[in-house]
């Protein structure tokens, strides 16, 4: 009997655990020179010894506490200037195993070790924060006097269109359609957003631009007056008949070049950010710095600025333009009106910015990064569009984002730098470039396959992945390992956004796009119960749960442009809103345990 009582339990590998949260690494985000306490968990009285192993030492850890059937071991190390990598060695009788980011393994693989990047910290407010993404033109029209009017200008093959019916489904080629959503509309709905439980508002681009998506920036220094305030207008200047010459678009030119309109729009934005901050909320802007638009004052392909006082000639217009080196031109003999510039993915409406050729451009965009996170706007961070594409080489790209981080953090140390990125982001998440990413690989994609069997654009259905827990867990673990814990806790975890089909639409397992399936197919046979299941996971998963406007109200839609339908004011699914509200208020917001393992 005494022999049986003295028997040790079977070695429990499932009880072995550690990670990079503040429960197992104190402080969780150390600086060079800090002494760090690293902890490891085992089942109580279940192992002989635990060692903390790094490049430089192998330290035997000591039991520092026992709780709920677990022993906790700890050891202290001092962090230098370089990356500190470590793993654990566990001994039980004749058994030796190892533990790192891969979990328990019988053979140590160094590439999966835990890593500490000295000085890499992400804003505490962003860890686990509930975010809400707004595509401004489709949220709420708060000021009809600033609406784009039909025929105001010509863009990609046709004239601008003012949509009169708020609930109209966007056209397949709807980039030039405008519903009138604006900053005042957001201001009018701050009570709703705060009551919902939103902590951070993320706005798709708001700077001057001819499209409704505004990823083709025309002027980085000003909010588009169509989103802001128009105090000086032109009663004439609408393009008539076959006229597609934007140098005749006097109404548009007046609205977007008159400094009174531009400054009034910036002032309104400053009021919006002040009110958001007064409520204890944050705001993030969308930064599109890889490319601009052909309407941009630096290029001026539409000759909007050519004869406007106070604006130098654009690079398209003149070889002597001060902005010539902001772009790469393939034919030096094609001026005036040189169309031979490089476009991003060969799009002539999206000129690629030539940072390597212009230090002036390089410094200008760094100043733009600083401007909007500083007074009077005090924006709380940037979401960076196609961030890995900026520049013409990998080395240059990394150097730019290092300088961008220094500039932004110098202006606002608590600003977040969050990048759009598909694929492994490890190279940018070392503490000196991006803080985190939009979490496609380690959240949106695996979750949508698991719960719906659908690809995130609704372009493919795979029954073998629907409900496949092994594939889901494997994908999540694999891709989460690419994110440093500080990045994982702030990663933007979305179910839907402006580039992918609405999650609720994916629940109908219908492969399609609006161009051939039609808009009705996006809402046929959807399953709100699966949507609620997804929201529950979203609100409890490590990271920053981010709601795409209208998802909480039951909005459907195939991939863009159908995913950019207007918010269904007066037609909301109130049960879905209430479900989101409960999840957001009682599961996600601060004081949420964002650091939970």
Residue ranges and their predicted role:
Residues 136-138, 201-213, 287-296, 385-391, ...:
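Short, solvent-exposed turn/loop segments enriched in Gly/Ser/Thr/Pro and often Arg
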Residues 431, 495-514, 519, 539-574:
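Aromatic/acidic polysaccharide-binding cleft in carbohydrate-active enzymes
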């Amino acid at each position: 009997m005494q022999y049986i009582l003295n028997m040790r339990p079977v070695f429990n590998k499932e009880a072995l655990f550690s990670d990079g949260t503040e429960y197992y690494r104190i402080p969780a985000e150390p600086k060079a020179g800090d002494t760090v306490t690293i902890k490891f968990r085992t089942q109580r009285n279940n192992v002989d010894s635990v060692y903390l192993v790094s490049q430089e030492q192998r330290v035997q850890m000591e039991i520092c506490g026992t709780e709920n059937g677990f022993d906790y071991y700890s050891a202290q190390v001092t962090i230098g200037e370089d990356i500190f990598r470590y793993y654990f060695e566990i001994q039980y009788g004749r058994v030796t195993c190892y533990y790192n980011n891969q979990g328990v393994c019988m053979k140590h693989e160094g590439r999966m070790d835990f890593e500490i990047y000295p000085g890499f910290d992400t804003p505490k407010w962003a860890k686990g924060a509930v975010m809400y993404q707004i595509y401004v033109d489709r949220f709420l029209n708060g000021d009809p006097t600033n609406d784009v009017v039909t025929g105001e200008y010509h863009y990609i093959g046709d004239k601008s269109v003012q949509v009169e019916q708020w609930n109209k489904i966007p056209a397949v080629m709807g980039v030039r359609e405008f519903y009138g959503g604006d900053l005042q509309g957001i201001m009018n709905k701050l009570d709703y957003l705060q009551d919902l439980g939103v902590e951070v508002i993320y706005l798709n681009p708001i700077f001057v631009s001819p499209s409704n998506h505004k990823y083709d920036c025309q002027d980085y220094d000003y909010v588009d007056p169509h989103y802001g305030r128009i105090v000086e207008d032109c009663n004439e200047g609408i393009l008539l008949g076959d006229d597609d010459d934007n140098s005749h678009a006097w109404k548009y030119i007046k609205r977007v070049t008159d400094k009174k309109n531009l400054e009034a729009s910036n002032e309104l934005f400053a009021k919006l950010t002040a009110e958001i901050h007064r409520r204890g909320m944050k705001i993030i802007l969308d930064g599109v710095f890889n490319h601009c638009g052909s309407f941009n004052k630096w290029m001026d392909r539409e000759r909007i600025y050519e004869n406007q006082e106070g604006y130098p000639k654009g690079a398209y217009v003149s070889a002597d333009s001060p902005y010539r080196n902001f772009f790469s031109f393939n034919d030096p003999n094609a001026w005036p009106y040189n169309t031979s510039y490089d476009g991003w993915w060969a799009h002539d409406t999206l000129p690629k910015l030539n940072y390597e050729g212009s230090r002036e451009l390089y410094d200008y965009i760094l100043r733009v990064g600083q401007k909007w996170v500083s007074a009077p706007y005090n924006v709380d961070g940037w979401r960076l569009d196609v961030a890995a594409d900026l520049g013409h080489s990998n080395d240059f790209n990394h150097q730019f984002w290092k300088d961008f981080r220094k500039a932004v953090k110098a202006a606002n140390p608590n600003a977040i730098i969050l990048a759009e990125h598909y694929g492994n982001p490890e190279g940018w998440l070392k503490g000196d470039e991006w803080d985190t990413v939009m979490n496609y690989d380690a959240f949106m994609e695996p979750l949508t396959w698991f719960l719906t069997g659908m690809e995130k654009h609704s372009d493919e259905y795979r029954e073998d992945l629907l409900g496949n827990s092994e594939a889901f867990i494997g994908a999540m673990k694999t891709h989460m390992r690419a994110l440093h814990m500080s990045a994982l806790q702030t990663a933007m975890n979305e179910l839907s956004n402006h580039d992918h089909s609405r999650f609720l639409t994916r629940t109908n397992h219908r492969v399609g796009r609006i161009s051939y399936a039609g808009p009705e197919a996006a809402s046929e046979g959807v399953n709100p119960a699966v949507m609620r299941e997804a929201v529950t996971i979203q609100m409890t998963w490590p990271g920053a749960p981010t709601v795409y406007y209208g998802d909480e109200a039951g909005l459907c839609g195939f991939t863009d442009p159908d995913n950019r339908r207007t918010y269904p004011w007066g037609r909301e699914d109130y049960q879905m809103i209430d479900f989101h509200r409960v999840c957001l208020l009682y599961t996600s917001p601060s004081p949420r345990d964002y650091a939970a393992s």
